[in-house]
């Protein structure tokens, strides 16, 4: 006997596989509806089966939570649409669930100068909460006031290699002069001092014991052993202490040209307690006469461990781990300076200035100045750099969480603005004391954040910051959650946001049927046409508990209506001037047509004289339909008729220049024409181009005014006849080019001949003539000796035979 489930599966295959078996759903109630979005409407609001998915699908989407909002056979996903569409379909405004992003200012102390810079409020607001809906930007304003006399901490970091010997003598007397100059702009200033040379390993310094003890060239000079970085003096307001500690310093020495300045900068930025940085403007003056080592150079000395980005100063202020960690990279240095809110000033000699100017592009809010050979201009250099850095306001941000973007609009001088790219900084230059600048910050999220994120915004070089509490809205707050709701078939499901989430084993829009009823033919009959033929739900949905659950934009008892099948105009459904309902466009009040493509307005058909299509046609869909023989946008032109340019040419000529065929009676013939001279900046297609009776070109524009015809004529430009100059110039140019080619040819031949002659002379000098035999020559004389013949003197005479060579 054949199992009933086998028969059912066989029938499903014959019927295209559409059955209630396809509609089994979980307790969430979402799998009963499929998604079939119109691909031509990607990026707009598409039907989705839940409120949460709806608000996350597109920022323009809203959800109608009204009970019984969807019609019979209409998918619950139709609750998701644009606000205007839902209101037009009868959803009350109070039943719309459309959470929006929002902002809440938590702390906003007013901007103030404070007492001589102390206690100033330069950045406002101080704390804000921003809630983002994915895809929807949120924009808020940040204000900055440059206060006068803002406190400054300045740390002087000096290269003490031997080549900086004369510079050290200047710096020993620097403390008082530097404090005096800085106190001119701020009453609260502190200075500190640190020095550097290089890593104490080969090949950076000599490891010969005597050289390690005294690396200077002369044994008579005062010299200290090489070191990487030494923090000498913490930040202080005592100028005498600065000069006293610097006076105790001596130069050192190393082998290679680049110095270990990056190690020193990184430690000065990381060891904030040892340096004594306050929460004020921080300046780091870096002086050197050479370039710097960077990440990877340490491998030359057998150092492979990358810099760990931590402070490694001992109790004496010496960087003790220089032989263990490689030099930091430019990115590490820039990140450490930015995190510590330190503004570096690179005071370097002219030979290395281009290198540090390139480095300046990679480190935010840094300055570069050219140092004289003996550092005599260092005070003025520092003051110039301080003025430049203080007048530049750069709004920086902490790292963003994944999926969140940021952009800036900098309003530096009134309404003028400079837009930055996403992730860029806001910046204003040349900001004066007591001047306020605005930054508009835009935040946008692409998806939900797993948890709240704290974002910091601050102006580089200043201590204040704005804290942004970043949240995302990713769920609906319908307020109608009801477990075992009577609305859902007497408690067969939970009600939330207007739809039922069925209990296990229950199905349907209202959880009205069970899984045991899926194979009932009576249920499927409710999803077919009365004649019993055709696919279930017209092939546009699924049969669910004897009722059709339609997909996409389909609706109706049998999903026979498709709200996305209406005609389109210029690729837009119903031309954008109506809504589609069951395959028919229902147009707005001022439009008509199968695709609402026809406007009932006649504004584009009215001619300047006030007539409709110039009296030579009729207006249809806000466009003139001309009668036979007429053409033009307003039917104002005809075959054989004069164009406006031809019609008013003589009046324009006589009225503007007093010439032409109408010059004698211009005021009579052209009485209804007003001619004015004008200097048009450019001539577009509307200007007439005609010639006067003496063949001079002129331009005029025909305008229709209430008082009559107005001709705007452009005055003739009196030019100079350049014919002779053009002819002479062309002739002279041809002659000059010819002479140039001949001279170039003769010059190339002369150069070639001289080169060949020199080569010939060189070969003659290298010749070494000597006499030698021809290896192919064979002598014609042959000598033969008779071994048995004994002469009188005991010698065997030789017999010489002469033969001719072949």
From Swiss-Prot:
Its main location: membrane. GO terms for biological process: cell-matrix adhesion involved in ameboidal cell migration; heterotypic cell-cell adhesion; integrin-mediated signaling pathway; leukocyte migration; leukocyte tethering or rolling; receptor clustering; substrate adhesion-dependent cell spreading; T cell migration. Residues 1-19 form the signal peptide. PROSITE patterns: EGF_1, EGF_2, I_EGF_1, I_EGF_2. It is a single-pass type I membrane protein. Residues 746-806 are cytoplasmic. Residues 98-123, 786-806 are annotated as: Disordered. Ca(2+) 2 binds at residues 198, 254, 256, 258-259. Residues 20-724 are extracellular. It is found in: Cell membrane. Disulfide bonds join 51-476, 54-80, 64-91, 216-223, 271-311, 412-428, 448-474, 478-497, 488-500, 502-511, 513-545, 527-543, 537-548, 550-559, 561-582, 566-580, 574-585, 587-596, 598-621, 605-619, 613-624, 626-635, 638-641, 645-688, 651-670, 654-666. GO terms for molecular function: cell adhesion molecule binding; metal ion binding. The keyword Magnesium applies. The keyword Nucleotidyltransferase does not apply. Heterodimer of an alpha and a beta subunit. ITGB7/beta-7 associates with either ITGA4/alpha-4 or ITGAE/alpha-E. Integrin ITGA4/ITGB7 interacts with MADCAM1. Integrin ITGA4/ITGB7 interacts with VCAM1 and fibronectin. Interacts with FLNA (via filamin repeats 4, 9, 12, 17, 19, 21, and 23). The VWFA domain (or beta I domain) contains three cation-binding sites: the ligand-associated metal ion-binding site (LIMBS or SyMBS), the metal ion-dependent adhesion site (MIDAS), and the adjacent MIDAS site (ADMIDAS). This domain is also part of the ligand-binding site. The MIDAS site is required for both rolling and adhesion. The ADMIDAS site is required for rolling and mediates the negative regulatory effects of higher Ca(2+) concentration on ligand binding. The LIMBS site is required for adhesion and mediates the positive regulatory effects of low Ca(2+) concentrations on ligand binding. This is Integrin beta-7. It comes from Mus musculus. The gene is Itgb7.
């Amino acid at each position: 006997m054949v199992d009933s489930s086998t028969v059912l599966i066989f029938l499903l295959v014959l019927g295209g596989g559409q059955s209630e078996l396809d509609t089994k759903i979980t307790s969430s109630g979402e799998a009963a509806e499929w998604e079939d979005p119109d691909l031509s409407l990607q990026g707009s609001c598409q039907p989705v089966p839940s409120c949460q998915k709806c608000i996350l699908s597109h920022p323009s989407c809203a959800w109608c939570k009204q009970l019984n909002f969807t019609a019979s056979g209409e998918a619950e996903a139709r609750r998701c649409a644009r606000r205007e569409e839902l209101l037009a379909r009868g959803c009350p405004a109070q039943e719309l669930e459309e959470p929006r992003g929002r902002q809440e200012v938590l702390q906003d102390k007013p901007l103030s100068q404070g007492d001589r810079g102390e206690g100033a409020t330069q950045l406002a607001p101080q704390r804000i909460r921003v809630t983002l809906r994915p895809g929807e930007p949120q924009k808020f304003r940040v204000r900055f006031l440059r206060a006068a006399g803002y406190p400054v901490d300045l740390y002087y970091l000096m290269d003490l290699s031997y080549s900086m010997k004369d510079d050290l003598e200047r710096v020993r007397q620097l403390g008082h002069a530097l404090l005096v100059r800085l106190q001119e702009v701020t009453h609260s200033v502190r200075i500190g001092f640190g020095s550097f040379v290089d890593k104490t390993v080969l090949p950076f310094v000599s490891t010969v014991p005597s050289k390690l003890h005294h690396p200077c060239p002369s044994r008579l000079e005062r010299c200290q052993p090489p070191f990487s970085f030494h923090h000498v003096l913490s930040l202080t307001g005592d100028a005498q202490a600065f000069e006293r500690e610097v006076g105790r310093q001596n130069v050192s020495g190393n082998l290679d040209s680049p110095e270990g300045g990056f190690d020193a900068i990184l430690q000065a930025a990381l060891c904030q307690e040892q340096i004594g940085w306050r929460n004020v403007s921080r300046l780091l003056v870096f002086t050197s006469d050479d370039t710097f080592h960077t990440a990877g150079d340490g491998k030359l000395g057998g150092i492979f461990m990358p810099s760990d980005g931590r402070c490694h100063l001992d109790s004496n202020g010496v960087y003790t781990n220089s032989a263990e960690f490689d030099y930091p990279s430019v990115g590490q240095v820039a990140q450490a300076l930015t995190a510590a809110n330190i503004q570096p000033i690179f005071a370097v000699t002219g030979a290395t200035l281009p290198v540090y100017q390139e480095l300046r592009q990679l480190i935010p809010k840094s300055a570069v100045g050219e140092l004289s050979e003996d550092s005599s201009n260092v005070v003025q250099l520092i003051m110039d750099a301080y003025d430049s850095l203080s007048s530049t306001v750069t709004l920086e941000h902490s790292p963003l969480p994944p999926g969140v973007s940021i952009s800036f609009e900098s309003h530096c001088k009134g309404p003028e603005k400079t837009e930055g790219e996403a992730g860029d900084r806001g910046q204003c230059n040349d900001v004066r004391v007591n001047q306020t600048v605005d930054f508009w910050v835009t935040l946008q999220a692409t998806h939900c954040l797993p948890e709240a994120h704290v974002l910091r915004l601050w102006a580089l070089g200043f201590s204040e910051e704005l804290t942004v509490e970043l949240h995302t809205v990713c769920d609906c707050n319908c307020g109608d959650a009801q477990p075992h709701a009577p609305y859902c078939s007497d408690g067969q499901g939970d009600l939330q946001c207007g739809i039922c989430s069925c209990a296990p084993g229950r199905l349907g829009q209202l959880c009205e049927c069970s899984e045991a009823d899926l194979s009932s033919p009576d249920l499927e009959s409710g999803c077919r046409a009365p004649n019993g033929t055709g696919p279930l739900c017209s092939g546009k949905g699924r049969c669910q508990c004897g009722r059709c659950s339609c997909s996409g934009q389909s609706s109706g008892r049998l999903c026979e209506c498709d709200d996305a099948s209406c005609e389109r105009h210029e690729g837009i459904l119903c031309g954008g001037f109506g809504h589609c309902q069951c395959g028919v466009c229902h147009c707005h009040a001022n439009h008509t047509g199968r695709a609402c493509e026809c406007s009932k307005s006649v504004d584009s058909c009215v001619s300047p004289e006030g007539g409709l299509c110039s009296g030579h046609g009729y207006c249809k869909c806000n466009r003139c339909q001309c009668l036979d023989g007429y053409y033009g946008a307003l039917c104002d032109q005809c075959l054989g008729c004069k164009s406006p340019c031809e019609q008013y040419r003589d009046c324009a000529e006589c009225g503007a220049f007093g010439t032409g065929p109408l010059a004698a009676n211009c005021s009579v013939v052209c009485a209804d024409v007003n001619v004015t001279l004008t200097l048009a900046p450019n001539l577009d297609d509307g200007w007439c181009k005609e010639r006067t009776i003496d063949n001079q070109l002129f331009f005029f524009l025909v305008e229709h005014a209430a008082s009559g015809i107005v001709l705007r004529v452009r005055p003739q430009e009196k030019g100079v006849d350049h014919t002779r100059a053009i002819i002479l110039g062309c002739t002279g140019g041809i002659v000059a080019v010819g002479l140039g080619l001949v001279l170039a040819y003769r010059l190339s031949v002369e150069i070639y001949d001289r080169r060949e002659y020199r080569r010939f002379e060189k070969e003659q000098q290298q010749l070494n003539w000597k006499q030698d035999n021809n290896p192919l020559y064979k002598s014609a004389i042959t000598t033969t000796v008779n071994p048995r013949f004994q002469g009188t003197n005991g010698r065997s005479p030789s017999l010489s035979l002469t033969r001719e060579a072949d």
